[in-house]
Amino acid sequence: MKFARLVAVTLLFLVVSGFTDCYKPVTNSGLPKHIKTVAVPAFQFEAKGIRYKVETRFTEAVMREVIRRGNGLKVQGTVEGADAVIDGNIRDFAFTGVLLDREGRARVYEVNIVCGVTIRDVKEKKVIYDNQNFVFRDSFEFSQDPRSFFNEEDPAVERIARAFAESVVSAFVNGIGVKDEKK
């Protein structure tokens, strides 16, 4: 009897104290309601030097991430018919040795990529998100044995592209840093 009364009082306290309001569902409230189709045109490579398909990897990573986390948003490569456009550019690409072995050869390399992204609302004709200084780093190690050599630069670029896409799409879909119009 005492235990049942204690449980009832505890439950009543929890309900009255407002603990039921602690849960807030995650929604895509950061996006304007009219945005249903997002265009992701090919990113531009503005960095010095030539890197094979870096901009393509970033474009594809963003498209995959919008499909994965966009709550039903349609993705296309062309601007025509889109409600929003994600424009991106690779502003800098640096590949440097950061740790040397006993012979003075680089064993650990670091890839630094600086990207810019602008997300525009086509219907309202305004910028809803802009960050021209996304900086991503990843490191990888070369094998000492030349027979087991595998170029780790490509997987490192893929990891950076995925991290970039996750950041951009998260900011876009969740409304983090989305520019609000002052009233």
Task: Give residue spans per PLM region.
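Bacterial N-terminal signal peptides that target proteins for export
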Residues: 1-8
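Bacterial N-terminal signal peptides
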Residues: 8-18
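A structural "domain/chain start" motif
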Residues: 18-60, 64-67, 123, 146, ...
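Short aromatic-glycine motifs in intrinsically disordered, low-complexity regions
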Residues: 27-28, 71-79
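Soluble non-cytosolic domains of exported or imported proteins
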Residues: 49-60, 106, 110, 150-163
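Structured segments of extracytoplasmic/periplasmic soluble domains
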Residues: 61-73, 93-96, 118, 122, ...
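Surface-exposed short loop/turn segments
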Residues: 73, 81-133, 137-151
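A charged, solvent-exposed segment within the mature domains of Sec-exported extracytoplasmic proteins
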Residues: 125-183
